[in-house]
């Protein structure tokens, strides 16, 4: 009887024509989960949509902007989902699977024009064998709800659906809503990052900070790298002036200063590499943005301390696009003013019954905004996914291959005017700070002997800060039985992360004459040199290494290092969770996280070269007139810090959390216990003379591995009777989080959270002698609201850190590298804010930003003396991004204009607050044209005003020193003006 009822009701729907209303409506809807997307479409079209929440649960609706008929707009919205629609009354449309039973694997039913009703045969009914008990009851509930919606205008749906089937997932109905209900565009968005179960959580209910971006929104940012994208997050300051790889990412109120120790980059919920505080490595350098990304979710703190890698900072989770029942794809080409040529592509569709696939990626080559006379960026990425759906869940496999080379950029010479907070920076003579860099054909190659009698080390700057990685993963989500679900995320990553770059060394430019005079003084102070040379030096000869021409004594020169680093990485992670519905509205999650990882490093730091202080520098040979050779083929010295180490780590964590909804309240609490085990070896080194000739000044004091090792192993340490040191290698720590959200209305909520997290020491921390575990206590309260024209999200926080290690390589007066280490705490208070206002139709005004008051405390060790109470290095007290955007409807096509003004406040480059980085502002803009349903043209530009913004001062200068000398300074500016033009075809 029930089956007959389903068929009768379904057949009554089939013969009803699609909307005959051919008038145009204006739509502006972003890519988002299908439920919220359909709700927003209903609101903007002023119609009723009826659909089952089960049916749309795993789908994403497409972005639509412009003027369309209701039928055309709905087709565009549902493009790629495999869903179809039928009219059931004058103002009501029902959403269905192509075959009417929710199976997305079959080809979608073509929707006829409004003037031509579909024949009944257009929607075949499958046999009863395809309908399990749960789906049958869900469909009956949906169809009863449909009858109520048609009869009563959609207002009696909820009660009838609940009466139909209390245990089935509640079908959803979207009706025209007033201004107060326009929250579905943002607050109804379902997020999966930082949540206990794979089903996710509405943003309205999340008791923590989360920022989301669709693929289209990611493109609008115009990010130069995966790190640069994080500027959409209110509390993130990403220093991306180093290029597509190798950034510094600062989180407001979190300690930092180098790399990105408090940022995890994940793919589909699995961290790419589970240790985040290694030198010459950050997660963002292992990831590239392209068309294979569906959306990004960035969570800051909150419940992140419980799940996955337990990141107490930010987790940027990138969800990959998957194939759907309806084949879709796109291909595009982008050209840029920096000599950029880039091709992107994506294709996804069905492979077999219940199987779906996707492939995509990019390839690009670029001269770079700072041209180096060879490709600055060259490489690409390929990603594939395979998804299988079955009655009780889904499994998705993915593979990602990244092979890329990126120019690494450090500090350049600048003119410093003024002092303290009044300092300003301008161009050094002959060196454009927006487009210049030392690298060029003359400095591209390195050949240097690093040990007595061994073959020379060779390296190429064109290999840059590269990545050669292979990543494989899978996500399994199963409904085990009533009230029990399972989620398992597995990922394996392996590959090579090399660094070949010029690192400026601790002293601003000086004239060749002044440099030679200092070298003469040093050589004459060495008795062995004077004896071998037959007396003291009184003069010098300097020539260009490339052509032998004499160098003018007034030419400015510098000594910069050609650093060569190789990191061989492997990691395996598994995140397994069971979620139990203990009783209605209460869910308990228990889980286990395992990470096994290794890093095999070989470093050659130093390799200092004497070069001109100009873009595309020339190497200089310098010889004193007593025969002493200061620089040979530009080299003033070989490796001053040679490191060979091998480390392995294993982290095992168990966690439990519970969420409980009580009327308008949603509470959650959880605890995590984690053990870390680390072992490894470091080869010791000895300072050696590479030959017996005292006149060869360039090969003295070379760091050479000597075959002896320091072993970091708990079992060995215990055998040697040093149990205290064993504690450095094996640690067990706990983390916890408690939060709650109160929903005042369906479009307004407030939340509060308290959590304590830990940050385990990395391999580098053990090597540097700072093996302590960091701790954070976080307190925050937030408020979210959305009306038809306004969205606001405000978070106020108090964060306390302890046991944070500090490490920096500084250059001594002799030119050698010294490793400066100490530990400290942090006291931080601040506010994050996100807002969007639409004062008139088509115009939106958006803002994101942060204000903070964060200072050092509890400094331990002389290296940080005097820093207590100082402002955290590199972090602005205030930063904000303001983006007005305007949509111009043009019939079947439309134009979108946007402009972004960014303000970055004053910062300090060092803990001693002596190296001041002035505030600056930038202006970015873009125009996007959607031409019909298939073509998109995008014109974007960044830093249009060519602002000189400095992100760091001399990275090798000791804390507490100004980093300037004689009006000269070193600093790393942001990139100058850049523009790109892209054309994409969608099919």
Residue ranges and their predicted role:
Residues 569-571, 581-597, 602-606, 610, ...:
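Structural signature of Gram-negative outer-membrane beta-barrels, strongest in the C-terminal barrel
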Residues 286-330, 986:
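A beta-strand signature from Gram-negative outer-membrane beta-barrel systems
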Residues 661-664, 745, 791, 798-800, ...:
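Gram-negative outer-membrane beta-barrel transporters
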Residues 315-350, 359-372:
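Short strand-turn segments of transmembrane beta-barrel domains in outer membranes
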Residues 271-300, 424:
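Short acidic/polar hinge/loop motifs at secondary-structure boundaries
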Residues 801-805, 842, 902-910, 928-987:
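C-terminal beta-signal and adjacent terminal beta-strands/loops
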Residues 176-179, 191-195, 199-202, 207, ...:
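Extracytoplasmic beta-strand/coil segments of soluble accessory domains associated
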Residues 376, 382-389, 394-471, 498-563, ...:
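Acidic/polar loop-and-plug regions of large Gram-negative outer-membrane beta-barrel proteins
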């Amino acid at each position: 009887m029930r089956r007959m009822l389903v068929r009768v009701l379904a057949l009554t729907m089939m013969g009803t024509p699609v909307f005959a209303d051919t008038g145009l409506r204006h739509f502006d809807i972003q890519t988002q989960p299908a439920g919220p997307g359909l709700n927003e479409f209903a609101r903007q079209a002023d119609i009723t949509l009826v659909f089952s929440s089960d049916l749309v649960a795993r789908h994403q609706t497409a972005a639509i902007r412009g003027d369309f008929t209701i039928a055309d707009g709905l087709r565009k919205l549902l493009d790629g989902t495999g869903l179809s629609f039928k009219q059931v009354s004058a103002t009501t449309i029902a959403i269905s699977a192509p075959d009417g039973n929710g199976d997305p694997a079959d080809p979608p039913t073509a929707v006829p024009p409004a003037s031509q009703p579909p024949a009944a045969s257009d929607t075949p009914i499958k046999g009863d064998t395809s309908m399990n008990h749960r789906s049958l009851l869900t469909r009956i509930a949906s169809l009863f709800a449909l009858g109520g919606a048609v009869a009563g205008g959609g207002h009696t749906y909820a009660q009838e659906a609940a009466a139909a089937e209390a245990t089935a997932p509640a079908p959803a109905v979207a009706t025209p809503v007033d201004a107060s209900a326009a929250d579905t565009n943002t607050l109804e968005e379902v997020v999966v990052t930082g949540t206990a179960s794979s089903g996710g959580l509405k943003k309205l209910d999340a008791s923590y900070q989360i920022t989301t971006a669709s693929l289209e929104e990611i493109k609008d940012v115009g990010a130069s790298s995966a790190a640069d994208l994080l500027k959409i997050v209110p509390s993130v300051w990403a220093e991306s002036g180093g290029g597509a790889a190798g950034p510094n990412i600062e989180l407001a109120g979190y300690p930092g200063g180098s790399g990105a120790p408090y940022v995890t980059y994940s793919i589909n919920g699995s961290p790419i590499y589970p240790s985040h505080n290694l030198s010459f490595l950050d997660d963002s350098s292992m990831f590239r943005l392209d068309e294979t990304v569906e959306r990004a979710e960035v969570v800051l703190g909150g419940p992140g301390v419980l799940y996955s890698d337990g990141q107490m900072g930010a987790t940027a989770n990138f969800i990959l696009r998957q194939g759907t029942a309806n084949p879709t794809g796109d291909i595009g080409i982008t050209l840029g003013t920096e000599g950029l040529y880039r091709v992107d592509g994506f294709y996804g569709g069905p492979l077999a019954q219940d199987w779906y696939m996707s492939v995509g990626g990019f390839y690009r080559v670029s001269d770079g905004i700072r041209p180096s006379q060879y490709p600055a960026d060259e490489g690409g990425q390929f990603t594939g996914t395979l998804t299988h759906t079955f009655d009780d869940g889904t499994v998705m496999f993915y593979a990602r291959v990244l092979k890329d080379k990126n120019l690494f950029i450090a500090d350049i010479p600048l003119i410093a005017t003024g002092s303290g907070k009044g300092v300003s920076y301008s161009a050094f003579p002959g060196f454009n700070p927006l487009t210049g860099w030392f690298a060029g054909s003359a400095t591209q190659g390195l050949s240097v002997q690093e040990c007595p009698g061994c073959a020379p080390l060779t390296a190429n700057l064109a290999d840059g800060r590269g990545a050669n990685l292979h990543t494989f993963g899978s996500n399994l989500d199963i409904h085990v039985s009533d009230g029990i679900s399972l989620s398992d995320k597995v990922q394996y990553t392996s590959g090579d992360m090399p660094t070949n770059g010029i690192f400026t060394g601790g002293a601003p430019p000086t004239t060749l004459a002044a440099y030679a005079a200092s070298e003469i003084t040093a050589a004459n102070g060495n008795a062995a040199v004077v004896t071998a040379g037959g007396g003291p030096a009184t003069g010098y000869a300097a020539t260009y290494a490339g052509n032998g021409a004499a160098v003018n004594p007034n030419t400015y020169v510098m000594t910069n290092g050609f650093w060569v680093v190789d990191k061989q990485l492997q990691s395996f992670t598994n995140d397994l969770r069971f979620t139990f519905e203990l009783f209605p509205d209460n869910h308990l999650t228990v889980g286990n996280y395992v990470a096994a990882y290794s890093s095999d490093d070989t470093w050659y730091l130093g390799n200092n070269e004497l070069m001109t202080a100009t873009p595309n520098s020339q190497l200089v040979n310098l010889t004193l007139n007593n025969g002493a050779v200061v620089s040979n083929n530009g080299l003033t010295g070989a490796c001053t810090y040679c490191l060979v180490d091998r480390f392995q780590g294993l982290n095992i964590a168990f966690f439990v959390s519970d969420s409980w909804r009580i009327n308008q309240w949603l509470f959650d609490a959880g605890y995590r216990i984690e053990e870390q085990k680390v072992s490894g070896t470091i080869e010791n080194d000895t300072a050696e003379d590479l030959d017996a000739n005292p006149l060869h000044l360039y090969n003295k004091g070379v760091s050479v591995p000597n075959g002896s090792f320091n072993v970091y192993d708990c079992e060995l340490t215990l055998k040697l009777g040093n149990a205290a040191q064993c504690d450095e290698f094996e640690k067990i720590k706990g983390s916890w989080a408690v939060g709650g959200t109160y929903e005042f209305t369906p479009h307004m909520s407030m939340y509060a959270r308290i959590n304590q997290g830990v940050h385990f020491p990395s391999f580098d921390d053990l090597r540097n002698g700072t093996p302590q575990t960091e701790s954070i206590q976080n307190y925050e309260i937030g408020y979210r609201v959305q009306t038809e024209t306004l969205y606001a999200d405000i978070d106020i926080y108090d964060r306390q850190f302890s046991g944070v290690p500090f490490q920096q390589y500084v250059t001594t007066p002799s030119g050698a590298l010294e490793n400066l280490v100490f530990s400290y705490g942090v006291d931080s208070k601040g506010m994050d804010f996100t807002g969007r206002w639409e004062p008139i139709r088509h115009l939106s005004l958006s803002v994101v930003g942060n204000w903070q008051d964060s200072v050092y405390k509890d400094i331990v060790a002389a290296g940080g003396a005097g820093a207590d109470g100082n402002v955290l290095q590199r972090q602005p007290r205030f930063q904000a991004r303001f983006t007005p955007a305007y949509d111009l409807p043009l019939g079947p096509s439309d134009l979108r204009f946007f402009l972004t003004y960014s303000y970055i406040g004053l910062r300090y480059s060092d803990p001693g607050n002596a190296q001041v980085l002035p505030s600056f502002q930038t202006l970015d803009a873009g125009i996007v044209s959607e031409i019909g349903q298939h073509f998109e043209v995008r014109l974007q530009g960044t830093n249009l005003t060519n602002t000189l913004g400095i992100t760091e001062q001399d990275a090798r200068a000791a804390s507490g020193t100004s980093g300037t000398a004689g009006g000269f300074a070193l600093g790393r500016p942001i990139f100058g003006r850049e523009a790109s033009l892209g054309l994409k075809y969608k099919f």
